[in-house]
């Protein structure tokens, strides 16, 4: 008797699941993988939905200015000059013309051997964090014909990359933080690494320190005054899983997954402390700071904007653009 009841219950649950799946099959879930602010627009890497340009002149009334579908899954974005550079998953690097943000156009692309997740542009080069394929160095001198000119294999999966003083700092997942000399971009050389991390997802450099978002490990502060001999000088567990970091004034804003945004005082990197936390409608993935505002991208919403108050805290409630296609 009990066996029949359980069988009927399982069938009912399965049937309800099929109904829900059918009802939601055509929906495009709002997802922001990464965000970069350039001029009066925030450019949001929207996964399988491509790249979005959002007008941010009125944070209380965020408006999608345009979008463009990319060949893969847009996971990272960096904007410079008249172009947005998109780390497009299995489709490598996509270059989008944004001279007119309301009418973006595809300009060029180059496939990469891995899964492009993050991108950083400096001079005539784009550095792509290419997951299992490590760091790819791409010449963008001719945006219509980008080409790979060098690569460095890393021990983990490269998620994101930052550049400071002729060095690239790669958040390399289980491989920790990898430091690569790029004085000669076509001849990059590994110089050091910090492997004693949990799962490095993102990195940002400010002054003499690299701050690493280390997923369940929280935040690590690394002294990089001598890039060939980096040292962990501080660590702080966050309540969620740290995915993205961005320094602003004496603070570090952390995209902390299901726990929204965490605000960390980094005036003393060896004794960091959480000074604020802010709710978001979904899981945060990436954060960008500019002047008096913080921009956050995540799943369950596309883009959120918080105002900075007194250089020490954010307004309690941010403004969110949940429906990126409206």
Annotate each language-model stretch with its function.
Residues 2-10:
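Bacterial N-terminal signal peptides that target proteins for export
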């Amino acid at each position: 008797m009990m066996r029949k009841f359980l069988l009927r219950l399982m069938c009912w649950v399965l049937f309800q699941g099929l109904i829900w799946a059918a009802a939601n099959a055509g929906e495009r879930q709002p997802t922001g993988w990464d965000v970069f602010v350039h001029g009066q627009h925030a450019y949001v890497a929207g996964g399988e939905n491509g790249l979005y340009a959002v007008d941010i002149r009125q944070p209380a009334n965020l408006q999608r200015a345009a979008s463009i579908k990319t060949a893969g899954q847009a996971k990272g974005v960096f904007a410079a000059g008249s172009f947005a550079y998109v780390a497009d998953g299995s489709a490598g690097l996509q270059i989008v013309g944004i001279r007119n943000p309301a009418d973006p156009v595809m300009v060029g692309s180059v496939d990469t051997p891995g899964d492009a997740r993050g991108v950083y542009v400096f001079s005539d080069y784009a550095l792509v964090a290419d997951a299992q394929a490590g760091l790819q160095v791409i010449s963008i001198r001719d945006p219509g014909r980008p080409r790979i000119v060098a690569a460095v294999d890393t021990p983990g999966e490269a998620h994101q990359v930052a550049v400071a003083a002729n060095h690239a700092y790669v958040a390399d997942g289980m491989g920790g933080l990898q430091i690569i000399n790029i004085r000669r971009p076509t001849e990059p050389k590994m110089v050091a690494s910090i492997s004693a991390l949990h799962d490095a997802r993102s990195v940002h450099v400010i002054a003499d320190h690299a701050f690493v978002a280390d997923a369940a490990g929280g935040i690590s502060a690394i002294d990089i005054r001598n890039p060939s001999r980096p040292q962990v000088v501080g660590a702080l567990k966050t309540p969620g899983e740290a995915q993205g970091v961005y320094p602003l004034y004496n603070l570090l804003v952390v995209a902390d997954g299901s726990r929204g945004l965490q605000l960390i005082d980094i005036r003393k990197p060896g004794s960091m402390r959480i000074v604020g936390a802010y709710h978001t409608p979904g899981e945060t993935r990436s954060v960008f700071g500019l002047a008096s505002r913080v921009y956050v991208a995540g799943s369950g919403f596309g883009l959120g904007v918080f105002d900075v108050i007194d250089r020490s805290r954010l307004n309690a409630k941010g403004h969110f653009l949940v429906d990126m296609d409206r």
